[in-house]
């Protein structure tokens, strides 16, 4: 059985080779007219410039954390693994974003020349590069680190590296994209009355750049962190559960998931008459079926039974069901979004109130599903089962990220088609692809939250084991634990306040700039004057880089401060409090934002007066409120709860040594 561990790095390399093949495949496609190429170049250069500037700042942060880990816990091997995790997360995000900004224009060109099927294939292939890089780098890194060290504690350093990059990528990307989006919508749509993706809008390029840095690179880093974190927790608990076999099993399951994701990619095929959504679902479901069957076989081989496989299947099924539930609350095909659209007829206030209500209601079923998953997994395999459920949920990350990253590529393709003045038939195709992309993006956010909850819980169990909380448990009547719980419960709200305020400040600057250009550049609204796109890109870039630091530093320092001052028990309370409120708040914000977005699109399809109506203006306001909800604060909370837990796990020896100052 021990030899099976080598499947992990081998399948990781296979995933990276498949990503390379898809990159070449996308690159060979026609990039369209000169105007299309010009617009795509603006988007590509803007995205690359932002990531380069962001990574320069992250180099300093990573270097400081490297020294703190080495000195703080006295283990430089863990510190080196931290560097590797940060490097791999950075590489996955950069490669995925780079290919996405090439796939967008080729998707638009395919829609123009070949129709729906070819456009879907290119957009999905571009997204699949991100997916394969996430699982490729994650599985290869985790596999090699464990093979070389056989030490789960060292492996937590690799996970912390992934988490550190993920937080800044998600927060920075989210602030960037939503500053541009809010500015473009409020001044362009509401004040000037021009359509979305209109080339007359100075913020339109920054908005399309934001799709890539936020929803491709940021989302990929988020799920890379969850993927690695689930493996770390499963390996840590697996050593206790079944020694070497317990540690190897999750790595082999992850390798199986990579194979299943590659197989699933070949099932994503559509035609001119079928729904692209069905094609994407076929790919995801086929990958899930392969993992279910394979996990039963592997469980029998490793443990001579099926209990461990059932824990994995619990996680996998819960992940799929959370995606379905998210679609019901955020898709225009269902009553919740239609209700918000109807409320828009009476103005922005009722639009916002209705969206908040839908978001709050949408927390119930996912939380119940997560609870059922935890109970089921624990019933069959104990605490190890909870970690396996997280591995199971994330086993098909390759195709999950591919489907999620497809969305912003399709959105960009529609923007390029609009700005290039392509015929309405082309925009009809890209609109269909984009509509599906909005739904898959919302489902992806739901999946990311569910996986973050299980991963954080599994890492929390690993932390409890590391500091010896299993023997005595956490005493909820201990004043230190209660203080920790209150502080932990508050942190997701404070974190969200920071990120929402950051978007507000950046959007204010963007709105002022767009208004200035409309007033001072002659003929801009008539299409005769040329907007200054670069100034808007610069505003988003500078704001995102400046504003991402405070939330990021808070996420790292809060658990260290509580652990040092109040001790390991209080820190356990903090992690538990943050997990409970963080998951609820993330679901609420992500689903409210998604519902507002699709209510606006539902009206734009001709309902309740269509584009330009009073209902549409109200829906645009709701969508604008929802933008930082669903693309900045909501997704970033996922990383907050995981990062605080992995920081606690890495620095557990230090907290035990100090034992608290009070």
Regions found by a protein language model. Name each.
Residues 1-662:
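Hydrophobic packing and interface segments
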